[in-house]
């Protein structure tokens, strides 16, 4: 069934989980390439905060906030969930939501990803001290996750779930931009978790697995 249209771009941190979930649930969604710095006027009228991704259903239903969109997709397609991605009881549902909120609201936040992510993208000039200090703060936060996944293969239960699809895909920006070989050795459990979830979430359909030897900021 055609569900509607996602407005974002394919490699946006919060977009691949939506595309992959829709694919696994046999939901047809379109992706209209949309960027923060070129947010269409008509779309801004519907979503004045101009955050990505946003979704407009085939029936005109408008929805923002990635967790809300993600959960809406699952509810619309859960009859096609042949992998057991969803919760089997209220406890699992609460645990899945906990992990999604944690990565979305406590880790992938402006306080943790800026200014290093903006410098990496070239949207602000590179400044060595600011880049390294902000990247170090981000890595300190990732050390918390490293301990949380130390004895876990999956976040909820003993199978790949919605929580892993969401959480794993949200880690990409860190591994792509600021986690070099030395740092991966400091984050062995997180690295194992990310690589495992990268493959189980089939994220190679959206971007390659990038585990750089060194951090190199592109010349802008």
From Swiss-Prot:
Give the EC class as a word. Answer: transferase
Q: GO MF annotations for this entry? A: glutathione transferase activity
**PROSITE patterns found in the cross-reference section:** GST_CTER, GST_NTER
Q: Which Gene3D superfamilies does this entry report, sorted A to Z?
A: 1.20.1050.10, Glutaredoxin
Write down the EC number: 2.5.1.18
Source lineage: Eukaryota, Fungi, Dikarya, Ascomycota, Taphrinomycotina
Gene Ontology cellular component terms for the protein in this record: cytoplasm; nucleus
What sequence ranges are listed for the domain GST C-terminal?
Answer: 89-216
Subcellular localization, as worded in the UniProt entry:
Cytoplasm
Annotated catalysed reactions = RX + glutathione = an S-substituted glutathione + a halide anion + H(+)
Similarity comment: family membership: Belongs to the GST superfamily.
Family annotation (SUPFAM superfamilies): GST C-terminal domain-like (SSF47616), Thioredoxin-like (SSF52833)
* Any one Pfam family match given in the protein's UniProt record, by short name: GST_N
Keywords, sorted A to Z: Cytoplasm, Transferase
The region annotated as signal peptide is: none
Q: Does the record carry Protein biosynthesis as a key word?
A: no
- GO annotations under biological process? cytoplasmic translational elongation
Function recorded in the entry: Involved in the oxidative stress response and detoxification.
Q: What sequence ranges are listed for the domain GST N-terminal?
A: 1-81
Q: What is its main location?
A: cytoplasm
Q: Which domain of life is it from?
A: Eukaryota
Q: Does the keyword Transferase apply?
A: yes
Q: Which PANTHER family match?
A: ELONGATION FACTOR 1-GAMMA
Know the name of this protein?
A: Putative glutathione S-transferase C460.02c
